[in-house]
Regions:
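S-adenosyl-L-methionine-dependent methyltransferase catalytic module, highlighting the catalytic core
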Residues: 70-78, 84, 88-190
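Conserved SAM-binding loop
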Residues: 1-101, 187-191
Length: 192
């Protein structure tokens, strides 16, 4: 399995305990060093240009990375590309208009990413880790739903609001509301 944006392998132990052969890819060398030593099977590279052949992995997984790349749907397409036929692609990402869309600059991101970034710097004396326009971008549920709807290489198995109770899943059908009450969106696909 491939963990796109997996950093130093935060999910490595859970996946290997379940029997998976784990590979991680990350573009941020600083993030890769987060747990100390870079783990085996770790590749430095871009999620938007995965350095693997088509159909290389049974499971391609990404947790909270799409909002950190300038072209999230290019990354999502790359993830589907390297998933083998019958395999699973799992994406989850933080929605910009959700409560934590601005990450550490929340809730000030509701006034714009540039404002939130400047305010954070003024308050803390340094830039936030997630810099608006550089390493943090606006990604919405609407974009994810549109992307999933036009997939010709994979079928959608589930689209759910991560961290929300099951009774709230129907809110994804209400434009506008879904953007604010959904903290994080999960899209699960099976490659055709």
């Amino acid at each position: 399995m491939l963990d796109v944006g997996g950093g130093p392998g935060y999910f490595r132990d859970a996946f290997t305990r379940s029997g998976a052969e784990y590979f991680a890819l990350d573009a941020d060398v600083g993030e890769l060093a987060g747990l100390g030593e870079i783990g085996p099977g770790t590749v430095i590279g871009s999620g938007m240009e995965l350095p693997f052949t088509d159909g290389s992995f049974d499971l391609v997984y990404s947790s909270n990375v799409l909002e950190h790349v300038p072209d999230p749907w290019r990354m999502a397409n790359e993830m589907v590309r390297v998933t083998r036929s019958g395999g699973i692609t799992y994406l989850s990402y933080t929605l910009w208009y959700g409560p934590w869309g601005g990450h550490e600059t929340a809730p000030w991101h509701y006034f714009g990413g540039a404002f939130a970034r400047k305010r954070y710097h003024a308050k803390h004396g340094h830039e936030p880790k997630n810099k608006w326009g550089e390493s943090l971008f606006k990604v919405t549920a609407k974009q994810g739903l549109r992307w999933a709807a036009v997939q010709s290489q994979a079928e959608v198995l589930a689209i759910i609001p991560r961290y929300n109770p099951a009774w709230s899943y129907g809110l994804l059908r209400i434009a506008g509301v879904r953007e604010v009450v959904t903290w994080n969106l999960v899209i699960v696909l099976r490659k055709l």
